[in-house]
């Protein structure tokens, strides 16, 4: 017996009046006029059924925190990061969970069933990690939540970032994150990419780095990330997030960079 049978729906590929048979959480048949008993049956009334939305870059630990501890008067990224630093000492596992769960439920209601969320590990208590691991487990029946160990204050710049990141990965965080443009120098940014990619390669994990999140055309950490991806055989497992500086770069340089990114299978999240 099927668990669920959804009748008379339209699919994105143009098929109409299709039935969808579901058992043990998986679609087992797509066809018209499926003849099978089901625990539950829904009449789709000819509505469109599509794959769920995916939010590939989010920060659930800071979701719904507008005005805490105060408003961002300048509206800039740097003030936003500073405000998050002011809020961190006031955080509790429960407060993070409450906001994150509310955001997850809101996302589910809008058709988003997969979220990749960065979680700040530059808090020696790892409260956000603990909270979002609990959220991941609670939301598991409804939402695929992937967590990225994110050194918000800089992997080399923050003294215990390496230790905290490894602790977070040991607890079950899924992806290695980074923020090379927030290190003190370009060379330290490159060094952070190298070390973080080596950690990911050693553990068989994916990488998702905030990269070049500025208007500076000389911020070219995506090139280093692409190189390390190739060097360590991480092809297809690495994401560059933001990549804002690319719009300011010289066209000739970008014409060289883009093929290298494609060759390495770099995923880009321009958000």
Q: What is the meaning of each model-derived region?
A:
Residues 1-50:
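Histidine-rich, glycine-flanked metal-binding segment
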Residues 64-96, 172-175, 221-239, 262-267:
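Active-site gating loops and adjacent loop-to-helix segments of metal-dependent hydrolytic enzymes
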Residues 47-69, 214-215:
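Di-metal (Zn2+ and/or Mg2+/Mn2+) metal-binding site signature of metallo-dependent hydrolases
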Residues 9, 25, 46, 57, ...:
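Divalent metal-coordination and catalytic microenvironments
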Residues 66-118, 126-138, 163-170:
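Alpha-helical scaffold segments that flank or form the walls of functional sites
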Residues 90, 117-243, 247-248:
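Metal-coordinating catalytic core of metallo-dependent amide/deamination hydrolases
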Residues 240-271:
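C-terminal active-site-proximal or functional interface alpha/beta core segments in diverse enzymes
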């Amino acid at each position: 017996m099927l668990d669920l049978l959804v009748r008379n729906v339209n699919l994105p590929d143009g098929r109409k009046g299709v039935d969808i048979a579901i058992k043990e959480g998986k679609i087992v048949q797509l066809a018209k006029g499926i003849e099978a008993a089901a625990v539950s049956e829904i009449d789709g009334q000819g509505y469109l059924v599509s794959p769920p939305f995916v939010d590939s870059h989010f920060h659930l630990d800071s979701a719904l925190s507008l005005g805490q501890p105060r408003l961002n008067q300048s509206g800039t990224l740097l003030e936003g990061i500073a405000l998050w630093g002011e809020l961190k000492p006031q955080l509790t596992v429960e407060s993070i969970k409450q906001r994150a769960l509310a955001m997850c439920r809101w996302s589910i209601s809008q058709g988003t069933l997969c979220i990749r969320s960065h979680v700040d590990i530059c808090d020696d208590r790892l409260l956000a990690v603990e909270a979002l691991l609990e959220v991941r487990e609670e939301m598991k029946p409804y939402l695929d939540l992937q967590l990225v160990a994110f050194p918000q204050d800089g992997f080399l710049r923050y003294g215990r970032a390496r230790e905290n990141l490894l602790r977070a990965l040991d607890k079950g965080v899924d992806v290695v994150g980074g923020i090379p443009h927030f290190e003190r120098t370009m060379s330290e940014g490159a060094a952070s990419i190298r070390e973080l990619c080596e950690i990911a390669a050693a553990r068989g994990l994916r990488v998702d780095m905030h990269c070049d999140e500025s208007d500076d055309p000389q911020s070219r950490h995506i090139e280093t990330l692409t190189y390390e991806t190739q060097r360590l055989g991480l092809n297809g497992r690495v994401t560059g997030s933001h990549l804002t500086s690319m719009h300011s770069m010289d066209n000739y340089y970008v014409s060289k960079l883009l093929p290298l990114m494609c060759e390495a299978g770099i995923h880009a999240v321009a958000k």
